[in-house]
């Protein structure tokens, strides 16, 4: 497996997770107080959009942490670069990945039980309840995962490899809603 191909896939997945989360969050939280009338006027669109962005953010984030050896994931990428990376640097990368993977595990559970393989016996509340995770923590995990991918790609600054800067898509969503008023 080529590390460059895997890294390109990781950038795509990190971009997707962050972008879809930001657009979903803007619609579900930031926009509600000021733009509820516009959102109600275009109800069908916003319901479909909210659902699509919600599901996509969990799917893209789960790509990053997929443990299958045939997937373009962080574990696969680390395996691919192990022999060509300084051992001390690799240990640091691996330790940081392990900490991030532990934090992301609840979101992979959400993806499995609510998005990809909808559990017939569990509601959204049943899935999220035992995970004891807040939306602020979810945002932090998504943003930290994207930053980790940017770092692996050698990005000199946030946004350099195409992953949007934090909040950019929320701002764009709110700008669109203001234009619809």
Show where each model-derived region lies:
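Histidine-centered, metal-coordinating catalytic motifs and their short helical/loop contexts
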Residues: 97-126
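Amphipathic alpha-helical interface segments
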Residues: 1-103, 128-181
């Amino acid at each position: 497996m080529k590390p460059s191909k895997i890294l390109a896939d990781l950038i795509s997945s990190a971009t997707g997770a962050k972008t879809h989360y930001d657009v979903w969050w803007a619609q579900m939280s930031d926009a509600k107080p000021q733009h509820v009338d516009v959102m109600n006027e275009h109800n069908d669109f916003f319901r479909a959009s909210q659902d699509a962005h919600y599901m996509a953010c969990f799917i893209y984030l789960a790509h990053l942490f997929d443990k299958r050896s045939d997937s373009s994931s962080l574990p696969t990428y680390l395996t691919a670069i192990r022999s060509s990376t300084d051992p001390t640097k690799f240990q640091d990368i691996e330790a940081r990945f392990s900490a991030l993977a532990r934090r992301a595990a609840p979101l992979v559970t959400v993806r499995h039980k609510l998005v990809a393989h909808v559990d017939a016996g569990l509601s959204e509340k049943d899935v999220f309840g035992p995970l004891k995770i807040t939306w602020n923590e979810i945002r932090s995990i998504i943003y930290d995962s994207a930053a980790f991918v940017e770092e692996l790609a050698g990005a000199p600054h946030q946004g350099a490899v195409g992953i949007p800067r934090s909040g950019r898509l929320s701002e764009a969503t709110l700008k669109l809603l203001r234009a619809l008023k």
